[in-house]
Structures are given as C-alpha cells and as structure tokens.
C-alpha cells in the first residue's frame, strides 16, 4: 500500500526535498540532457552558441586533469544547505590537518549516489573549510563525465576532478601544500553492494592510491561515512546471480555501474528514486604519515596498504556504536 506524504508540509522541508530532487536529477540525467541540448542547438538559429562553446571546450579540454575549476560561490550556494538538512549530513573531525601538507583521503563507502562525499567535499554545507582551515578539497570522478558539454563545468565548480593518474599527480605536486584529494576507493563497482546494513568495502586489491601517496609523500587520511549505505534499497544482486553478472559486464564495458536502487518518491514514501531521510555522519580520521618514495616497491605498497586498512578499521570500531552499528559487526573487505 502506498504511503503518501502529508499535504501540509513546512516550506523548509519542501525546499530540502527540492534540493535533493535536483541533485538526483543531476546525477542521473543532467549529463545526457546537456549533450542533447548541445547537439540540438546546432540545428537551430542558436547554433553559434554551441560552436563557441565547442571552441572553449577544445581550449579547456585538459582542465579536469589540472585541478578543475572550483568556485567558492557555487560551493556555498544555499541549495546545498537545504540538501544537507534533508538527511541530515554532518562532518566530524578527529585530528588536525596541517595546511602545509598535501593529503590523499580514502572515502568509504561509495553508497549508491555518494551523497556524503559530494556534500562534505564539494560544498561548504557541512563547513569543511571551517573545520580544516587552509585545506582545499577535491574529489575524483570518472573521466567519462567530463566529456559531457556544460555538465563538465557544473561538476568542476564543486571541486570534482578527473580520476586519471595525471590529475592526481597535478594536485599532489602543488607546492605549499593545503590540498586534499579524496578518492572513493571502492568506486562504481562498490555501489553494487550499497544497501542498508552493508559494511562490505572494495579495498583488498585497491592499491593505486597507496602508490600515489608514496610517490608524492602525501599523508593518507581514512574517511568513513556512517549511514551512506542506508539511503536506498537495492534489488537483490548477490555475487553469482544473473543480475550481478550483467551489472559486472556492463561496468567493465562502460566504466560505470548500474545498481537497481529504489527509495521514496517526492509525494509518497513507498517507492521512487529519492533517497530516504537517513542521517549521514562522515568521520575524518587521523592522517597517516607517509615518507616520499618516488619508486615504491611492491612490499612498501603492501605494507602501507595494510596499515591503512588497520587505521580504517580502528576508525570504524571507535565510532560504530554511536550510530547503532551492532558490536559484533566489523568491516568486510573484498
């Protein structure tokens, strides 16, 4: 039976719902819409607009691999505050970050739509720069999304950058420090395991970010986002099922995963693509000091990788009881 939302809802909550609705639309369909508009304009009297943009696009092609184009005005827009209050989302600091250093932050888990990563690291809705003065945050995103006209400029405004190695090298090589490059380590594939109560992380063989940290001497910061997996339900797709096989194949072909998720609707609570109103608390752990090693050996990478996993588990265990995680629940790695 469908459970409808009440008619008399405070304007504050309506604005929160609208803020999340536009974000879900942006995540699922804005890139495709931008491509349609770009091509469509070529067949109208406004064709010159697309031609001029194409020229700009050509000249600006490498920008996503060169730190992007973060705009503070965009990051501070009121709409992100409303989106943050919808869940709500909060950011917790457990240690100081020295603004003279550069950092690689591993963000866990991905969730379905990475709401916590976006709000905490690409907007000022949770006060990132107030908690970590002198630190500029960047978040890596699949390169394919920067191939969409107009959309690329939109996502770069929040501090999103291409997930290529050259992009990471550019940010981590900046003199003077103060840069935090966040990587959702589990990536698109981990989204296929995002469901309420899931604590399975795709990390066991993900060592590229460890190698980057060693090559640049960037401190590693583990981040765990409690509640990230509680925003949506997902159609059963355990490994070995035909659905999971199809999803894995599509992920290898396209580079993006296609989780069959569902949440609530705008006017009812029973079904839809809107996330549930579930709190997200993102805990930023203590940085792990890393000695610069321009050409790290496999043993050095493995050693630091194990230390990172140990610190991530410690962070999870220290805080899990505050968020109603069972005492016997531990992180699982695959």
From Swiss-Prot:
Coiled coil: none annotated. GO terms for molecular function: 2-acylglycerol O-acyltransferase activity; acetyltransferase activity; diacylglycerol O-acyltransferase activity. Its main location: endoplasmic reticulum. It is an enzyme of class 2 (transferase). InterPro entries: DAGAT. Optimum pH is 7.0. The chain crosses the membrane at residues 23-43, 212-232. It is a multi-pass membrane protein. One of its GO terms (biological process) is monoacylglycerol metabolic process. Belongs to the diacylglycerol acyltransferase family. This is 2-acylglycerol O-acyltransferase 2. It comes from Mus musculus.
């Amino acid at each position: 039976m469908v459970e409808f939302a009440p008619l008399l809802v405070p304007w504050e909550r309506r604005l929160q719902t609208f803020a999340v609705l536009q974000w879900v639309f942006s995540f699922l369909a804005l890139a495709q819409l931008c491509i349609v508009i770009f091509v469509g304009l070529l067949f109208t009297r406004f064709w010159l607009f697309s031609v001029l943009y194409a020229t700009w696009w050509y000249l600006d092609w490498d920008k996503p691999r060169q730190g992007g184009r973060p705009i503070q005005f965009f990051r501070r827009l009121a709409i992100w505050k409303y989106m943050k209050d919808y869940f709500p989302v909060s950011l917790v600091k457990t240690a100081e970050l020295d603004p003279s250093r550069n950092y690689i932050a591993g963000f866990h888990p991905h969730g379905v739509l990475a709401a916590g990563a976006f709000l905490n690291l690409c907007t000022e809705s949770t006060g990132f720069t107030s908690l970590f003065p002198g630190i500029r945050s960047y978040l890596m995103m699949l390169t394919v999304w920067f191939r969409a006209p107009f959309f690329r400029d939109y996502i770069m405004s929040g501090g999103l950058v291409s997930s290529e190695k050259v992009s990471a090298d550019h940010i981590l090589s900046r003199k003077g420090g103060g840069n935090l490059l966040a990587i959702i380590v589990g990536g698109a594939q981990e989204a296929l395991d995002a469901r309420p109560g899931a604590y399975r992380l795709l990390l066991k063989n993900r060592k590229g970010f460890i190698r980057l940290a060693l090559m640049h001497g960037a401190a590693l910061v583990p981040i765990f986002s409690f509640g990230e997996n509680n925003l949506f339900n997902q159609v059963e797709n355990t490994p070995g099922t035909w659905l999971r096989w199809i999803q894995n194949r599509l992920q290898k072909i396209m580079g993006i995963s296609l989780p069959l998720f569902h949440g609530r609707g705008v006017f009812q609570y029973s079904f839809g693509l809107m996330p549930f109103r579930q709190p997200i608390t993102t805990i930023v752990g203590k940085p792990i000091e890393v000695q610069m090693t321009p050409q790290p050996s496999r043993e050095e990478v493995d050693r630091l990788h194990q230390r990172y996993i140990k610190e991530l588990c410690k962070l999870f265990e220290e805080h899990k009881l505050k968020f109603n995680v069972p005492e016997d629940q531990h992180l699982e790695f695959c």
